[in-house]
Amino acid sequence: MKVLLVNGSPHQHGCTYTALAEIAHTLQEEGIDSEIFWIGNKPIGGCIGCHGCVKLGKCAFDDDPVNAFTAKAKAADGFIFGSPVHYAAATGNMTAFMDRVFYSDGCGKGRAFYLKPAAAVASALDQLNKYFTIAQMPVISSRYWNMVHGFTPEDVMKDLEGLQVMRVLARNMAYFLKCKAAGAAAGVEPPKTERAILTNFID
């Protein structure tokens, strides 16, 4: 089993990385592999609604980390997305990245995320969790909000409560993945899916 940890910070080894590294260490203790995927610090454009992903099965733009991540996501069993908070929300790059990752996978019928557990590590939990619920991903919690505090990685290492929250999150993720694997081995089928009913709130 493997969990992809997404570092949405423009700083490769900053505070967000420090939180994800704490999670990775605890996952390893639980027998779960992990990989930290950094989205980089170059500009990532937002979705332009071209619907090229419907035909291609991936985003039409191939000059940034979006398609590379989605390809990795197909083989992953769970996800944790981390982002610093810029103006009460995730970074612009992280938002554009997740918009295109989830939209292109959904429209391209990729199902890289369907029924796979996910969690967000950021003060912008509600914003990031919306991606998971739309993609029908079980959302993994901890014992408090999934966040750490500090201006530097050294500050984060002093946030003992925040680091504990990261460890609890990792153990909860590991527990869910093991339960999911045990259920599959026992013959428990995924829930039946229905064709989406789209309401435009006009008619």
Regions inferred by a protein language model and the residue ranges of each:
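N-terminal beta1-alpha1 ligand-phosphate binding loop
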Residues: K2-E30
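Residue-level recognition of beta-strand->loop/alpha-helix junctions
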Residues: N7, W38, R143-Y144
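Glycine-rich phosphate/pyrophosphate-binding loop and the adjoining helix
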Residues: E29, T133-I134, P138-D203
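A short beta-strand-loop structural module common to alpha/beta enzyme folds
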Residues: I32-K42
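Cysteine-cluster motifs in flexible loop/terminal segments that predominantly coordinate metals
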Residues: K42-K74, L198-D203
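Short, hinge-like loop/turn segments at secondary-structure boundaries
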Residues: H51-K55, D99, K158-L160
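Helix-loop-strand module that forms the ligand-binding subsite of alpha/beta enzymes
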Residues: A60-Y144
